[in-house]
Each structure stands twice: as structure tokens, then as C-alpha cells.
Amino acid sequence: MIYTITFNPALDYISKVDNFEIGKINRTKEEKVLPGGKGLNVSTVLKNLGFQSTALGFIAGFTGKELKTEIEKYGIQTDFIEVKEGITRINVKISSDVETALNGNGPIITEEDIEKLLEQISKFNNEDIVILAGNIPKGIKNNIYEIICSKLEKNGVTFVVDSTKELLINVLKYKPFLIKPNKEELEETFKEKIETNEDIVKRA
């Protein structure tokens, strides 16, 4: 089975506005609400390619329930952990002459919630594939990816990491099957500007 893990999924509220003006009432031309988060995006692409996956991660409140409903409408299996405090974040995307985004913070994830996720992971074996994608919300220790990857490696699980900075660097010793930083994430990780393809190859 393929599993995707998204620590901080979101409902993306996308609105198109002609000539968006700050400080004024703007009428939307088009609106849609979509599940968001790197891991969920991977599950969606896999579904479109004919591969089933199970989406893992944390949800909370009425927005979490809506996120779960929307994901399952796509025919994607879910096994989310419902946390008690806060709501799944809403990210507002305004599309006009330029793109504007307002990203929410997300719910409070406790140590107890983390333990539930680690318990899920402990059942995976060498027939499973795990895709660990995106960043982590505030309050979670930045060694969480390292903890997860050490358990996956111990159980012979194939895993992929799509993240940046310390979250990515700290798991390289566990030899993920694949990492997928884009240009901006490479710049964040190495703390320097990348100008050419040769620069990208050198950092890779």
C-alpha cells in the first residue's frame, strides 16, 4: 500500500477576482474549495494515474470533516487522526492581476496525537511505500521527520521525502528512496541563491 502523510493539510478557498483592490469590496468571478497539502496532492495525482493510496495526517473541527469528505469524494482512502483543539486550516487564494495567498496556522497537535501517528507507522512493512510531504505546524519538534524515517528504515519501508531545510537534511542519513526539493526549497536549504542548472546539479 502507498501512504501519504500530511501534517498540516488545508482547505484551499480559491477565488478569481477581476482587478482586485485592497481595502475595497471585491466581487468574486469564480470560487472553488479544494483539499490542499503536499501529501494530499500526491494522493490525488496517484489516483489520477490509477494508483490507490491512503492519506494520513491530522484534521480538526468542521473544516477537518469537510476536508475528509472532499478527499474521499475523489475515491482516496483516508485514515486521519482527529485532534481535539483548533480547526484544520483554511488557505485563501485570490487570483487577479497578481496572486495573493493567506495561509492559516492549523490545529494544535499534541504528543498524544503524534504517538497515534507513530503507532500507525509501526505497522508498515517492506511491501509499503510512504510519502512524507510538506512542512510541519508550529509546536511540533523539528526532528519528527527524523523519528518517522528511522522507524520506516528499521521496518524496511520504502519512503520518499518532499520537504526542505532541517526536515530534509536530517533524514538523508536514513537514505530515502527519493527526495524532491524544487529550486526555491534548495535555496532555503542551502541558504543561497541558485541561478543556473549547473548550480542545481551541484547542490543535488
Please report, for each region that a protein language model flagged, where it lies by residue.
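Positively charged, low-complexity intrinsically disordered leader regions
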Residues: 1-23
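General beta-strand structural signal in soluble alpha/beta enzymes
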Residues: 4-5, 80, 131-132, 159-163, ...
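Cofactor-binding loop segments of dinucleotide-utilizing enzymes, especially the Rossmann-like FAD-
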Residues: 5-9, 58-61, 83, 135, ...
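Substrate-binding N-lobe of the ribokinase-like
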Residues: 27-87
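Conserved phosphate-binding/catalytic loop of the ribokinase/pfkB sugar-kinase fold
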Residues: 83, 94-126
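Short, small-residue-enriched loops and turns at beta-alpha junctions
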Residues: 107-110, 136-140, 167-169, 188
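Conserved phosphate/ATP/ADP-binding segment of small-molecule kinases
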Residues: 146-204
